Structure formats: structure tokens, C-alpha cells
Amino acid sequence: MSKTPLSIVHPWHGPVLTRDDYESLCCYIEITPSDSVKFELDKETGLLKVDRPQKFSNFCPCLYGLLPKTYCGDLSGEYSGQQSNRDNIKGDGDPLDICVLTEKNITQGNILLQARPIGGIRILDSGEADDKIIAVLEDDLVYGAMEDISDCPGSVLDMIQHYFLTYKATPESLIQAKPAKIEIIGLYGKKEAQKVIRLAHEDYCNLFM
């Protein structure tokens, strides 16, 4: 009896991003709020790898991962620059990041889930576009009814923004008030998030298809 070799779908290239014009999204989760290690997808192998231990006391306050078949390239960078009033902004060359809100205690990464985008955070990281889409887990009992970022509690948005402002900072840089590499330009709602996702999807198609 012959054995058929198993093939693993690459989380970045395999799953279908959306079937309904970016209303519902397939998301690949890399990090959970309980992780004391920063995991990230190895783009070459499709395996989840250890990027680095979390060195300081900040933990990601939500599920965090990427959107399959997205890439922050020329279109994403140009649009971010336009919306930020900055010149020569490029995409960061990675899949588009996503934060997923849920009241459930999901403690395992390296999973796929369906979520609905409600908005996003426009971020520049060392002068590169590095937006974070904010979404809610489909049918979540607490967050599932939210339609737009205006429905999300401000305290939740504050925690997410604080994490991204500080997760790369050292105590020394904070004490000495050194200029931050991470700059939050602002928040945006669902329609803008869908446009950011569409441009990142087009960047992916231009690069890989």
C-alpha cells in the first residue's frame, strides 16, 4: 500500500483571504495574549517560528497575526503616505497585520479563524507603512456585534495602541525619551480598513501572481 505524502498549506499563500468583498476575512494567528514569546510566520517554510522572547512586561492584548494573500508593497506604502501627509513612504514588505478581538480565551497560535474588520491603526515603523487591521471574531458573544471601530471601547483601543508604541522600546529609551521608531498616525473605520486590505491584496497579486 503506497503512502501519499502529506502537504501542508502555506498560511500566507494558501488560504482564501475573503469570499465576500472583505466583509469576512480568513486570519492566521501567530500570537495570543498569553504568549511570553513573540512568534511569527517563517515566510519561506510556512512554519511558525520563535522570533524572540518578550523581553519586557508588555504582552499583546489581543490575538495577533496576518492576512493571507496580502503584502505591504508599493500600493500600500503610497496610500499610507498620502493619508499620513508623508513623502517616500514604502510598505514594510510583510503581510498585512491583524488584531482580532474576542472574549474567548484562545491560548494557541498557528490557527486560522474568520473575523470581520471594523477598522485599523495607521502606523509608521521606521518610516515604513505598518498598519494594523482591527477585527472581531465572527459570532463572538461580546465583540461580534461591533460593526465599526466607533463601537469598540476606547480602553481596548488604548491598550492595543500602547502595546504597539512600546513593544520594541527599551527601559533606557523610555527613560531618556529617545525618539520612537513607531509612530501612530491615527485610527480609521471599517470602510478605510477594507481599502487598506484591498490594496495589500493587490500588492500581493502584483508580486506573486
UniProtKB/Swiss-Prot annotation:
Gene3D superfamilies: Inorganic pyrophosphatase (3.90.80.10)
Biological processes per GO annotation: phosphate-containing compound metabolic process
Positions contributing to Mg(2+) 2 binding: D97
Catalytic reaction list: diphosphate + H2O = 2 phosphate + H(+)
PROSITE patterns on file: PPASE
Name the UniProt record assigns to this protein: Inorganic pyrophosphatase
Subunit structure: Homohexamer.
Organism: Chlamydia muridarum (strain MoPn / Nigg)
Binding of Mg(2+) 1, residues: D92, D97, D130
